[in-house]
């Protein structure tokens, strides 16, 4: 039984922490792997350093680098795992590009979708968990946790508000694969809600 489950959300939504905790619960009963974008494979990790830690770059260059990393990650890690019948939990996927580069950067959602559809070749997630939190709360968490801020973290509040608007538009248009989880609650509640959402999906397939 394979399933491709992606996690989306604005900066400070707690995605990485939630995925880790959900993974350690799921692995007791399912053949599951956890991965991330950009990254997940050596080439992807090198691209991650460029787009998240490097200097400012042309917005279309940024979008193409994310798409290139995505393709390499799919071919080397995600697709083989799905063929082996695994459950794949992925921290970010195509919807991040649509929300960040397509909407917030202003390239255009459909333009970025076309670029990424070439990269993913039809492989959309079976289920996408959206961790819903406001830009203000996300920013406060990043500052409070003193985490290392990447290039996207350092964008202004208006940019992050646009990211959320982009996600809302995507979810409205593709509501069948999205499940929204309230991430503005205690972490253990977010983890439990996310875990139960995934279990309900897996029990149906």
From Swiss-Prot:
Name listed for the protein in its UniProt record: Thymidylate kinase
Organism, as annotated: Staphylococcus aureus (strain MSSA476)
Reactions performed catalytically: dTMP + ATP = dTDP + ADP
Alphabetical UniProt keywords: ATP-binding, Kinase, Nucleotide biosynthesis, Nucleotide-binding, Transferase
Gene name of the record: tmk
Role description: Phosphorylation of dTMP to form dTDP in both de novo and salvage pathways of dTTP synthesis.
GO molecular function: ATP binding; dTMP kinase activity
Entry annotated with the keyword Kinase: yes
InterPro entries: P-loop_NTPase (IPR027417), Thymidylate_kin-like_dom (IPR039430), Thymidylate_kin_CS (IPR018095), Thymidylate_kinase (IPR018094)
GO BP: any one term: dUDP biosynthetic process
């Amino acid at each position: 039984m394979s399933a491709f489950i992606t996690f989306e959300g604005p900066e400070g939504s707690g995605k990485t922490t939630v995925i880790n905790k959900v993974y350690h619960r799921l692995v007791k009963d399912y053949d599951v792997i956890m991965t991330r974008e950009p990254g997940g494979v050596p080439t992807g990790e090198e691209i991650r350093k460029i787009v998240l830690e490097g200097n400012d770059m042309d917005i279309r260059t940024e979008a193409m680098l994310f798409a290139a990393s995505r393709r390499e990650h799919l071919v080397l890690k995600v697709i083989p795992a799905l063929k082996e019948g695994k459950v794949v939990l992925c921290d970010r996927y195509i919807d991040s590009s649509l929300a960040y580069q397509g909407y917030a950067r202003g390239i255009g959602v459909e333009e970025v979708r076309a670029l990424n559809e070439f990269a993913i070749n039809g492989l959309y997630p079976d289920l996408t968990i959206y961790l819903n939190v406001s830009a203000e709360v996300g920013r406060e968490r990043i500052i409070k946790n003193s985490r290392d801020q990447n290039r996207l973290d350092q964008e202004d509040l208006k940019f992050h508000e646009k990211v959320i608007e982009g996600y809302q538009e995507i979810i409205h248009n593709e509501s069948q694969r999205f499940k929204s989880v309230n991430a503005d609650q205690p972490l253990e509640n977010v983890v439990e809600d996310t875990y139960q959402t995934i279990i309900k999906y897996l029990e149906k397939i």
